[in-house]
């Protein structure tokens, strides 16, 4: 799928950076620092939902490197569980955005953030 291991590293880093960008755009709304615009939230969640499926294939065997810790490959089952928890939380975030319910959106947003943090704490090298 990737010609060189470094291509996989760049691909997953790019996908994760874009996810962080679209997630971050919703933070002021969730924190009550910006008005709730349902259409804008839905647009960001839709992009996030699409992006959330992308980086995982770029963590295949032989693609070690970047900010990824070796435990991704040595404890692949746990990594996959955290990946699945994240994607399950994205589905909940999408449902909350579709419902237009700010309280549900806040709760789901928190769950997505917590799943991001759990994976980063376990599998991303400290900067």
UniProtKB/Swiss-Prot annotation:
UniProt entry keywords in alphabetical sequence: Electron transport, Heme, Iron, Metal-binding, Periplasm, Pyrrolidone carboxylic acid, Transport
Modified how: Binds 1 heme c group covalently per subunit.
GO cellular component: periplasmic space
Keyword check for Calcium: no
Modified positions (Pyrrolidone carboxylic acid) in chain numbering: 1
GO MF, one annotated term: heme binding
Protein purpose: Cytochrome c' is the most widely occurring bacterial c-type cytochrome. Cytochromes c' are high-spin proteins and the heme has no sixth ligand. Their exact function is not known.
Name assigned to this protein: Cytochrome c'
Lineage: Bacteria, Pseudomonadati, Pseudomonadota, Betaproteobacteria, Burkholderiales
């Amino acid at each position: 799928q990737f010609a060189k291991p470094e291509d996989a590293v760049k691909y997953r880093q790019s996908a994760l950076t874009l996810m962080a960008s679209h997630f971050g755009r919703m933070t002021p709304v969730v924190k009550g620092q910006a008005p709730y615009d349902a259409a804008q939230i839905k647009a960001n969640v839709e992009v996030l939902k699409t992006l959330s499926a992308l980086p995982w294939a770029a963590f295949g065997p032989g693609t070690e490197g970047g900010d990824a810790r070796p435990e991704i490959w040595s404890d692949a089952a746990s990594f996959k569980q955290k990946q699945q928890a994240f994607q399950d939380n994205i589905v909940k975030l999408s449902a909350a955005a579709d419902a237009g319910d700010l309280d549900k959106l806040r709760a789901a947003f928190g769950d997505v953030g917590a799943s991001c943090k759990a994976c980063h704490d376990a599998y991303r090298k400290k900067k």
